[in-house]
Amino acid sequence: MSTDPTASFYTDNAAIYAARERRLPRQRMDAFLAALPARATILELGCGSGQDAAYMLSRGFDVTPTDGSAELAKEAEKHLGRPVRVMRFEALDATEIFDGIWAEASLLHVPRSALPDIFDRILRALKTGGIFHASFKAGEAEGHDKFGRYYNYPSAVWLEAMLSARGWKNITMTEADGGGFDGEPTKWLYVAAHK
């Protein structure tokens, strides 16, 4: 049993979390996919239920779904009918393998002090010109939700400065109102960047 409340949440609630109904707009994913070559290789970091991977696969992309929770990976495998790699972000050790990396609502659990290393690993794993997408719950300081899950809650200014300092190019940030599993109104921060 993990002593990390965030990891424990996903272990203990994998089936409920994976089964929840998510009807998210596809505009961001469609824009991400449209910028990639046909049959591009995509790494999904934190695939959860596998919903996004399923959509990308249905569009003809070569997707490698991953999740840090073995229990959520099993749920995604049921949905996808294919293996899902159990991998924590800090285990990413690839060099110029992927055309795109998709991290929807997953890197928001990485401690701020660890984000530079994770962004470096993602940058290294992308091919030259590769595209990165991530989303975060916006804020000004680290904190926890009512389930005890850790969030890094970055601001757009803080996040853009960090990515720029690490060598990312063509960084775009957008914000949108939304929600999350906790049912609370949420300001979401969406990031797109290129290697």
Question: Residue spans of the language-model regions?
Answer:
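A short glycine-rich, Lys/Arg-flanked "PGG" loop and its adjoining helix->strand segment in the class I
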Residues: P116-T128
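Acceptor-substrate binding/catalytic loop of class I
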Residues: G143-W158
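Class I SAM-dependent methyltransferase SAM/SAH-binding core
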Residues: S49-A91
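Conserved class I S-adenosyl-L-methionine
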Residues: M1-P37, R39-G48
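A short acidic, Gly/Pro-enriched loop at the edge of an enzyme's catalytic core
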Residues: A91-I101
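Core SAM-dependent methyltransferase catalytic element
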Residues: G180-K195
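Conserved beta-strand signature within the Rossmann-like core of class I S-adenosyl-L-methionine
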Residues: G129-F136
